[in-house]
Amino acid sequence: MAQHETDAVIVGAGPVGLFAVFQCGMVKVRCHVVDALEAVGGQLSALYPEKPIYDIPGHPSILAADLVERLSEQAAPFAPTYHFGTQVSTLSRLDDGRWLCGLSNGDSIAARAVIICAGGGAFGPNRPPLDGLEQFEGTGVFYLVRKREDFRGKKVVIAGGGDSAVDWAISLSEVAAKVMVVHRRPKFRAAPESEARLKQLAETGAVELVVPYQLHGLEGENGTLSAVVVATLEGETKSLPADVLLPFYGLSSDLGPIAQWNLGMDRNLIAVDPATGATDAPGIYAAGDICTYPGKLKLILSGFAEAARVAHSAHDVVHPGEALHFEHSTTSGVPKG
């Protein structure tokens, strides 16, 4: 069990957490970063690394994985210490005013400031209730697309009617041997332009729409999927030859220990002062999707601005009484970590 000391602990290594490392470094606040996943990037890396993002300033389009890589490179000069595959399970105040973060792996970190950038908390897919599902998970059933090329030449069944299902059906139609989309109703819940594109592909035969049907069963052996059985609400079934099933039924999230930290929760979000990012607890701040305040916009762009705000707030508790002389990065450059 290792004991660490630093200026600030950042909870979450997603895009906002990574940018918080950079912003803290710019104001001479050293950071340790804790994330339950095994690498940086949060949902961008774990769920849709190859999906394009369109609302990052200066990037008409950038892949999620590329954005994570650049944010990580931007934070690197400040030499943050990462703690992957663990979470902050306990948070307590020390006699000297610092916060002690107890990690689930037994380590601990003492810091003047804690910055929570945990998004929606720990997350996982909503799994379809199918007999024998477990034997195909990781071999024929996947809940995310890491690399589109993994599906080249394969028969792919996509289940769901939201943006993820529709967007991936469109994308995978370019590489898969066949794409079938199973949805329990003819109308989809995706962006209108995406739904229109999907129907165009269906008209040309590039995608097959299997509606109104829902998942009913799986066929195969030794972890190798051979078919997906679907059924109507009336019980009529049919078998779809398939190599892969991608159920896109959304995610369930859990704040875990964060919900027990008495930080002024508001519908599973942390209420903060919009001027400082401060929570109800002194020295604890929040940024990104996990925080809320009047007029909050849940955008990565907003999270970046909040990361800058909380970094400046953290400076005041890490270096009390030390005036922060603000300079634009074009003037100051990037200090060494």
UniProtKB/Swiss-Prot annotation:
Pfam families: Pyr_redox_2
Similarity comment: Belongs to the ferredoxin--NADP reductase type 2 family.
UniProt GO molecular function: ferredoxin-NADP+ reductase activity; flavin adenine dinucleotide binding; NADP binding
InterPro entries, per database record: FAD/NAD-bd_sf, FAD/NAD-binding_dom, Fd--NADP_Rdtase_type_2, Ferredoxin-NADP_redctase_2
Record: residues binding FAD: 35, 43, 48, 88, 123, 289, 330
Name of the protein in question: Ferredoxin--NADP reductase
Keywords: FAD, Flavoprotein, NADP, Oxidoreductase
Cofactor: FAD
Catalyzed reactions: 2 reduced [2Fe-2S]-[ferredoxin] + NADP(+) + H(+) = 2 oxidized [2Fe-2S]-[ferredoxin] + NADPH
The keyword NADP is annotated on this UniProt entry: yes
Cofactor note: Binds 1 FAD per subunit.
EC number(s) recorded for this UniProt protein: 1.18.1.2
HAMAP family assigned to the protein according to its UniProt record, in alphabetical order: FENR2
EC supergroup of this enzyme: oxidoreductase
Coiled-coil residues: none
Assembly with partners or alone: Homodimer.
